[in-house]
């Protein structure tokens, strides 16, 4: 089958032919329709330090997808041939303390699709049926293919009650931008997002941001004054992994505020703990999606009017994958979709 793989320990990916995956007793085989390019895939493309330490070579990658079930293992229940599905990209052990307590997103033995094992940038993907998630007919293939990052945004944004709250989001990547739409959808008052990328800040405005602030040119404090915010933000969502952004977020938080961290900062990043301790801040680390509460919330929000369509900005046939990666690398894109049926 056709697949997009890392064949050499060097930058780039190669469109190649690989063996179609075998289907275990508890697996489903998915014929891929659409995939989306993730920031993780950009790390793999660049072959940075993280990728060199993490990614087996050779291996086809990718973990954001939608497709239909074409084969099932003999022990699979609850699915049928032809079901349209996406899937949870974190495959968990089922036996550790957290898995057995129903907290699978905290499994200490997590294996990542397209990171630690063969991925979705291929014509077919085999995954445990437990990880497959049926997509309702009213949700498009494009949106279904980005449920993985949409889930990151949902898990982060809904970590705390947002109704009537003032929310600061640092980092206007696709996940941060989707968090804007989620926060407004569930009833936040002011939703302010910061970055230095004008293209993505404009996308955030389209998705409902109260203010999208280029911090290279505009003061966050001035924006807070403009919005008549006298005490700081109630909820902070750190999506960038940039130390200076995290610092500014902590400084802008109100006393008793709550902070969720999805962005991954460099090791040994300095924190002004006075901001945390004397403000009584609550800080929560976010990894992946809650299984499968996050997934049900994503569907419910889309069915109740959440519009994420502006976040998909580029679409390419898989044979033009290099154009798709170029769009992502340019910084002037939202989500980039690769069509495996074209």
Curated annotation (Swiss-Prot):
EC number: 1.1.1.103
Main location: cytoplasm
UniProt-recorded Gene Ontology molecular function terms: L-threonine 3-dehydrogenase activity; zinc ion binding
GO biological process: L-threonine catabolic process to glycine
Any one GO cellular component localisation term in the record: cytoplasm
Co-factor(s): Zn(2+)
Enzyme class: oxidoreductase
Binding site for Zn(2+) 1: 38, 63-64
Keywords assigned by UniProt, alphabetized: Cytoplasm, Metal-binding, NAD, Oxidoreductase, Zinc
Cysteines paired by S-S bonds: none
Alphabetized Pfam families for the sequence: ADH_N (PF08240), ADH_zinc_N (PF00107)
Site (Important for catalytic activity for the proton relay mechanism but does not participate directly in the coordination of zinc atom) residue list: 148
Pathway involvement of the protein, from the record: Amino-acid degradation; L-threonine degradation via oxydo-reductase pathway; glycine from L-threonine: step 1/2
Intracellular or extracellular location(s): Cytoplasm
Function: Catalyzes the NAD(+)-dependent oxidation of L-threonine to 2-amino-3-ketobutyrate.
Family (UniProt): Belongs to the zinc-containing alcohol dehydrogenase family.
SUBUNIT field: Homotetramer.
NCBIfam families, per database record: PRK05396.1, tdh
Name of the molecule in the record: L-threonine 3-dehydrogenase
Organism from which the protein derives: Burkholderia vietnamiensis (strain G4 / LMG 22486) (Burkholderia cepacia (strain R1808))
Gene name, Swiss-Prot/TrEMBL: tdh
């Amino acid at each position: 089958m056709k697949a997009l793989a890392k064949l050499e320990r060097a930058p780039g990916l190669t469109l190649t032919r690989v063996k179609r995956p075998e289907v275990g007793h508890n697996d489903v085989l998915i014929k891929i329709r659409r995939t989306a390019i993730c920031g993780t895939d950009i790390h793999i493309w660049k072959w940075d330090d993280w990728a060199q330490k993490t990614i087996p070579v050779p291996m086809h990658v990718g973990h954001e997808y939608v497709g239909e079930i074409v084969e099932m293992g003999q022990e699979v229940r609850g699915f049928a041939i032809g079901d349209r599905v996406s899937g949870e990209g974190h495959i968990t052990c089922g036996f550790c303390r957290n898995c057995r307590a129903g907290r699978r997103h905290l499994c200490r033995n997590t294996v990542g699709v397209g990171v630690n094992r063969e991925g979705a940038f291929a014509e077919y993907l085999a995954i445990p049926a437990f990880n497959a998630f049926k997509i309702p007919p009213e949700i498009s293939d494009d949106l279904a293919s980005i449920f993985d990052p949409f889930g990151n945004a949902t898990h982060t944004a809904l970590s705390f009650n947002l109704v009537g709250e003032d929310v600061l989001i640092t980092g206007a990547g696709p996940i941060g931008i989707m968090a804007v739409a989620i926060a407004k959808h569930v009833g936040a008052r002011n939703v302010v997002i910061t970055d230095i990328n004008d293209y993505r800040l404009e996308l955030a405005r389209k998705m409902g941001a109260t203010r999208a602030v280029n911090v290279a040119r505009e003061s966050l404090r001035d924006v807070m004054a403009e919005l008549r915010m006298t005490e700081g933000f109630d909820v902070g969502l750190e999506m960038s992994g940039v130390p200076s952004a995290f610092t500014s977020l902590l400084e802008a938080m109100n006393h008793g505020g709550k902070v969720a961290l999805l962005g991954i900062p460099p090791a040994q990043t300095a924190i002004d703990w006075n901001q945390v301790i004397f403000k009584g801040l609550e800080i929560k680390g976010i990894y992946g999606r809650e299984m499968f509460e996050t997934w049900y919330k994503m569907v419910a929000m889309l069915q109740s009017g959440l519009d994420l369509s502006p976040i998909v900005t580029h679409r390419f046939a898989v044979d033009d994958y290099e154009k798709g990666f170029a769009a992502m690398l340019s910084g002037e894109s939202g989500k980039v979709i690769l069509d495996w049926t074209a």
